[in-house]
């Protein structure tokens, strides 16, 4: 402007060069899990990519999640993981479970915290998510007023940028214990 003042508008655009990320998740990938594609470990599921990182990890690991719908229950236990989607409306991590849904692994109800589509455990310090939709796709209609959590975050120093949370009831659960700090930024 003529008065010397400048107004800046902030846009959250993720542009990662091939050196900007460590792992790729692509729902259309049909090769062997963890195989190198363009010098990057590549997986078809977020869970496989997350589980490829050691729980003793000490350095930031950036996972690029390509546009797509990933129907899976994800638990993050390793520190310093970043999940970066290509587009917050086109990169969707979803699961369908409520507190009364039977967990096929245990035969018991998930419970409220267990219904989460994504759980960030307390040891997953420094977790970040950017340009994603985290959704619990449970439909309450015809069911009894059940909680269906999209994100259960128990970790300290978590940051969520341009991340959409979609759920029916109790969408976001900040679930840290009283004795452990859990600074979470949304």
What are the residue ranges of the model-derived segments?
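Short, solvent-exposed loop/turn segments at the edges of extracellular beta-sandwich modules
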Residues: 1-4
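C-terminal edge beta-strand
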Residues: 6-15
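Long, low-hydrophobicity, solvent-exposed regions enriched in small/turn-prone and acidic residues
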Residues: 18-20
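Feature marks extracellular polysaccharide-active and adherence modules
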Residues: 26, 66, 77, 84-86, ...
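Acidic Gly/Asp/Thr-rich repetitive segments characteristic of extracellular carbohydrate-active
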Residues: 27-64
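Acidic glycine-/aspartate-rich tracts in secreted/extracellular proteins
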Residues: 29-30, 68-69, 87-89
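Extracellular beta-strand-rich solenoid/capping regions of secreted or surface-exposed proteins
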Residues: 51-56, 71-83, 93-128, 138-156
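Eukaryote-skewed repeat-based solenoidal scaffolds used as protein-protein interaction platforms
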Residues: 146-147, 151-152, 158-160, 165-186
């Amino acid at each position: 402007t003529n008065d010397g003042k400048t107004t800046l508008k902030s846009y959250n655009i993720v542009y990662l060069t091939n050196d900007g990320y460590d792992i790729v998740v692509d729902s259309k990938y049909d090769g062997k899990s963890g195989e190198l594609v363009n010098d990057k470990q590549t997986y078809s599921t977020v869970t496989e990519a997350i589980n490829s990182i050691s729980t003793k990890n000490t350095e930031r690991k950036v996972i690029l999640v390509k546009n797509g719908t990933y129907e899976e229950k994800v638990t993050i236990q390793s520190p310093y993981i970043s999940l970066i989607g290509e587009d917050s409306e086109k990169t969707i991590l979803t699961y369908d479970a409520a507190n009364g849904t039977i967990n096929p692994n245990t035969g018991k109800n998930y419970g409220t915290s267990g219904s989460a589509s994504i759980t960030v455990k307390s040891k997953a310090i420094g977790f970040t998510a950017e340009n994603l939709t985290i959704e619990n796709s449970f439909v309450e209609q015809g069911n009894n007023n059940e909680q269906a959590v999209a994100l259960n975050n128990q970790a300290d120093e978590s940051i969520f940028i341009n991340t959409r949370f979609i759920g029916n009831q109790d969408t976001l659960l900040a679930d840290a214990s009283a004795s452990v700090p859990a600074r979470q930024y949304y």
